[in-house]
Every structure is written in C-alpha cells, then in structure tokens.
Amino acid sequence: VPYPNLAQADENALRELGRKIRFYPEFPKGANVNFCELTGEDEVFERTFERGVEDFTYACGTGTGCVVTALTLMGKVSGRQVRVNMTGGQLIVDVDLQGNAVQNLYLTGPTNIVCKGEVTDEELSLI
C-alpha cells in the first residue's frame, strides 16, 4: 500500500488502517499489509502489519519481496539492488524478470538468532 510520509505517520492511525485491510472480507484468511514509500532512487521505506501478530513487525521478507516486485513491475524501481529500510534494518532485493514474469527473487540482509530450542524424536512423531 503506497503511503506518503510513512516514517512520520501516526502509529495508531496506521495500525487501524492495517487492521481494516488485514480483515477485509475479500481476504477470508486475512492478509499481511505492507505500507511503503519511495524514499530515493531504488530505495523504499516499508512497514508491515502482520496477521497473527496483529501489529507491526520489524521486518517481513515475503512482504518485502512482494513490495519490490510490484514496484518493479510498475516501473517505480529498477528491480536491481533495491534497498528496503524497515524498523528491523535493511534488505537488498533483486528481482529476476523474464518479460513480465518473476523468475527469481533474491533478498540479502543481516540475520539474528532470536531463539534456540530442541525438537525431540517424540515431538517429530506428532507431525
């Protein structure tokens, strides 16, 4: 969703809009809502209102890929080395197009370990 002055947007108003779109009847299972603003040549600022979390998250790789793909197909960005800035940091996105069809999508950025855990053999048998 294009949104001018996204970085200065009222958080509560943006959250309410995200919630309305997330629960829109055309999306029976709900949807993540990605707000974006072009901030420079091949540079985007993005905020994601994520279903299940029901609030903004620091980043969403799937949503970021969709935003850059849509902007590329609309001719707003080149699709090469597009910098997407989010609360959680920056991703670099490359869109590999064959005509108007996306063949591959590459996201590059930092990673962090946020949780460690163990899965036992007994737990695997439940799946």
Give, region by region, the residue ranges found by the protein language model.
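An anionic, turn-rich surface loop/hairpin at beta-sheet edges
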Residues: T62-G63
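Active-site proximal loop and beta-alpha junction motif in alpha/beta enzyme cores
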Residues: V1-A59, V68-I127
